[in-house]
Amino acid sequence: MPRLEPGMARIRVKDLRLRTFIGIKEEEILNKQDVLINLTILYPAADAVEVNDIEHALNYRTITKAIIRHVEENRFALLERMTQEILDLVMENPAVRYAEVEVDKPHALRFAESVSITLAGHR
């Protein structure tokens, strides 16, 4: 993860719990499962700090709503695909300089709490 430089802000969305179709086994194809999504986003925030106006900030609510809609309305065979599609949604915002997306699938393995995939993008 890039170092946080002066004038930059780091936004973290933690444990966004959604339900979707994820997996390749029959029961996964037929039944929605929980996934936990964690986001880290870096963007230049000097204007937002100075002006104190949402028009100058990265609106994490807008990004989160787009992710919720996309994840809940689609089906995914692989965590890798879901993670990349979420990362693509985040990176659509031109203010984003760096983003990291982790998708966690609880109880994906019998003796593990969860399995997760993390992908990152930057410009």
Curated annotation (Swiss-Prot):
Signal peptide: none
Protein keywords: Isomerase
One GO BP: folic acid-containing compound metabolic process
Assigned GO CC terms: cytoplasm; cytosol
UniProt-listed SMART domains: FolB
Disruption phenotype: Deletion of the gene abolishes intra- and extracellular monapterin production.
InterPro entries registered for this protein in UniProt: Dihydroneopterin_aldolase (IPR006156), FolB_dom (IPR006157), GTP-CH-I_C/QueF (IPR043133)
Pfam family for this entry, one: FolB
Enzyme Commission numbers on file: 5.1.99.7
Role played: Catalyzes the epimerization of carbon 2' of the side chain of 7,8-dihydroneopterin triphosphate (H2NTP) to form 7,8-dihydromonapterin triphosphate (H2MTP). Is required for tetrahydromonapterin biosynthesis.
Family statement: Belongs to the DHNA family.
NCBIfam families for the chain: folB_dom (TIGR00526), PRK11245.1 (NF008418)
PANTHER family, per database record: DIHYDRONEOPTERIN ALDOLASE 1-RELATED, DIHYDRONEOPTERIN TRIPHOSPHATE 2'-EPIMERASE
Subunit field text: Homooctamer. Dimer of tetramers.
Name of the protein described by the UniProt record: Dihydroneopterin triphosphate 2'-epimerase
